[in-house]
């Protein structure tokens, strides 16, 4: 029986090794990655450890994306993969854990160059600014549903954009939360006399719904808000903008929403 067990273990090892050595480029072709919005100049390595050069997701350049699996993590019932993104839009690294119930993004940090986010309102990209993301845990189903998480985010977007209107905009801080099973950046101002809240909810097509509300009596701030597309409504200045991503959304949020469609 011991000899039979060794034979079984040998063949199982061969199967695992064969799967691990499967070329990344062929795996992406079988998955139809390009039809789902993922483009790249070249794929290296295997599905176990590899990289993509000049990666692009739904029209957004990512640069080089690399990953390496941790074989021993399988003993815990989940496969852990270390990843790195390096490009003009973002520089970050972290870990993804693939288990029976879905994916967990953990121990991830990234600095995002807001000026290079193609889908974002051009008025918010006129001055250089950064979005700093620190994800302790973000749980997603394999269908893409957001299940919860813990994170910290910070941006100097308003500080950068406000300078041209003599407004020292505050830093915005917050967290990445789940809204209707979708990841959402929920932020508020850090200090200052004005009351500012902002939320950007992502969809599974690479689009988003951005909403913000500002309460202020500062004339310089009001001038800046109007130039950025805010509307006076109920004693506050309100901003809403939607990018539906790669396909038209069946339903649209109530209110005045500007829509951008980035279909290929």
Regions found by a protein language model. Name each.
Residues 2-23:
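Hydrophobic membrane-insertion alpha-helices, especially the h-region
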Residues 4-7, 33, 167-264:
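Extended terminal
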Residues 24-45:
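Alpha-helical transmembrane signal-anchor/signal-peptide segments
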Residues 28-35, 57-59, 82-87, 161-168, ...:
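Short, solvent-exposed secondary-structure boundary motifs
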Residues 38-127, 136-138:
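N-terminal beta-strand/beta-hairpin edge segment
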Residues 68-72, 97-101, 143, 177, ...:
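Short beta-strand micro-motifs enriched in acidic
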Residues 81, 149-151, 210:
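Transmembrane beta-strands of outer-membrane beta-barrel proteins
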Residues 127, 132-199:
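Solvent-exposed beta-strand/coil patches in large extracellular/periplasmic or lumenal scaffold regions
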